[in-house]
Amino acid sequence: MTQLETRTEPMVVNFGPHHPSMHGVLRLVVTLDGEDVVDCEPVIGYLHRGMEKIAENRTNVMFVPYVSRMDYAAGMFYEAVVVNAPEKMADIPVPKRASYIRVLMLELNRIANHLLWLGPFLADVGAQTPFFYIFREREMIYDLWEAATGQRLINNNYFRIGGVAADLPWGWLEKCRDFCDWFGPKIDEYEKLITNNPIFRRRIEGLGTIEKQDAINWSLSGPMLRASGVPWDLRKVDHYECYDDFDWQVASEKEGDCYARYRVRIEEMRQSLKILRQACDMIPGGPTENLEAKRLNEGKGSDAAGFDFQYVAKKVAPTFKIPNGELYTRLESGKGEIGVFIQGNNDVTPWRFKIRAADSNNLQILPHILKGHKVADIMAILGSIDVIMGSVDR
């Protein structure tokens, strides 16, 4: 009796760019041996819009509205880093109040970013219910943004060289405190529903494991790096804005798998709430209505009219020239380290403007961690990275 030998030919499968689980126009050319992934080649560039070249032909004030279209889930981070670069080059001070307002906006954006990651990620692995829960909370963040900036999701156009475009409106800090009180129990609700759910844990534990040294070697950042046991957060490392004024911890895990990345992001939302509460209480001058009352009561020369109580140091003229020199500045977004390398030549537009997107770097490790996994695991692993193709392709 002869024994039959079965041999499978490698099969090349095309995922995307039009696929609901691709998180944008990402294309993966995957080589399969049966159901096992042998190789994976990401094809990017479908959403390339030449953002760096646009920046080199615009003044800073003209370019700020563009940047929220890169990472359209977290536009405030790009607004912040784009104004930070000329500020540092020209040594422009930022009032303490403006710095606190920036932190409030950035931490709200971090929560919104993680919520928009959480819903689709869970939908990718088969949990549909939380997808609807997260939009309920994000709406409240959008309402806060709309009150302060006039826009909801993108094109907030709120950050300016030397501060922000306008002070917080009356009653905004109270609304922000209300959101913190509302959202804290909602994180507990998510955890009850998801964290120890046996189906969820069996589905993603052990998937896409990245060792600590691999995470460092591949230049990962954000939750991807911290989930592999490296507690590296630029808010602690670079001491930018006024993060040193607040009491908060860096969220990190050691396992390095999809589940660890989920745990890091959940904890980051809790830490962002801590920062928001402290910033609402400690903001110089307090709520706008209190600050205006102090200025009126105390008249000319009031301390409440001092530098640190202003929302912008000095409104920069449209003819503001970026000094000669070069500089790299970075900050911690919801996805990791985003940075800008700017080269000035004493002109209103930069000579060179290079943007480092966190998810673009984080995506590079995908073929490495997909090999050996099943085809059904591709979407779970890709979802855990948190990519937005607008900033990957730029």
Curated annotation (Swiss-Prot):
Transmembrane annotation, as ranges: none
UniProt-listed Enzyme Commission number(s): 7.1.1.-
Catalytic activities: a plastoquinone + NADH + (n+1) H(+)(in) = a plastoquinol + NAD(+) + n H(+)(out); a plastoquinone + NADPH + (n+1) H(+)(in) = a plastoquinol + NADP(+) + n H(+)(out)
Membrane protein topology class: Peripheral membrane protein
Gene Ontology, cellular component aspect: plasma membrane-derived thylakoid membrane
InterPro entries, sorted: NADH_Q_OxRdtase_suD, NADH_UbQ_OxRdtase_49kDa_CS, NDH1_su_D/H, NiFe-Hase_large
Recorded GO MF terms: NAD binding; oxidoreductase activity, acting on NAD(P)H, quinone or similar compound as acceptor; quinone binding
Gene Ontology annotations of biological process type: photosynthesis, light reaction
Subcellular location: Cellular thylakoid membrane
Pfam family, one: Complex1_49kDa
Subunit-structure text: NDH-1 can be composed of about 15 different subunits; different subcomplexes with different compositions have been identified which probably have different functions.
Function: NDH-1 shuttles electrons from an unknown electron donor, via FMN and iron-sulfur (Fe-S) centers, to quinones in the respiratory and/or the photosynthetic chain. The immediate electron acceptor for the enzyme in this species is believed to be plastoquinone. Couples the redox reaction to proton translocation, and thus conserves the redox energy in a proton gradient. Cyanobacterial NDH-1 also plays a role in inorganic carbon-concentration.
Name assigned to this protein: NAD(P)H-quinone oxidoreductase subunit H
Organism: Parasynechococcus marenigrum (strain WH8102)
Gene name for this UniProt entry: ndhH
